[in-house]
A protein has these predicted regions:
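Conserved active-site tyrosine of GNAT-family acetyltransferases
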Residues: 10-15, 68, 97
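Conserved acetyl-CoA-binding loop of GNAT-fold acetyltransferases
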Residues: 17-22, 72-74
Length: 108
């Protein structure tokens, strides 16, 4: 679950940046779907860091990072490979302040 102080802004961000579809939207609770994944947005909060970050995987994490910035998100740690890990990993904050990991599997 992600927190949102502005539900319309939060729903728009995840729809336009990542292609999530709306299952339901209200001021205080919204559900979005992408493939088999569903995320919930809880409204009425000031946003902020979620204790367990959501991780989204992409075929092109660098393009995803560009979409994040274009839509008002902030890159905290640009996508890069960490030593010994088979992924590119980046961290950003959405416009509501939630911390999200973005990854791309690159093999061994």
């Amino acid at each position: 679950m992600l927190m949102a102080s502005d539900m319309n802004r939060a729903v728009s961000f995840y729809r336009h940046v990542f292609g999530f579809e709306e299952l339901m939207v209200s001021d205080y609770w919204s559900e979005l779907k992408h493939g088999d994944a569903i995320i919930a947005l809880h409204g009425g909060y000031g946003g902020g860091r979620n204790p367990i970050p959501l991780t989204l995987e992409f075929d092109d994490v660098l393009a995803a990072a560009e979409r994040v910035v274009a839509a008002g998100g902030k890159i905290i740690d640009a996508p890069r490979q960490r030593e010994g890990e088979p992924i590119l990993l980046g961290v950003f904050r959405d416009p509501e302040g939630n911390e999200i990991f973005i990854t791309q599997y690159i093999g061994h």
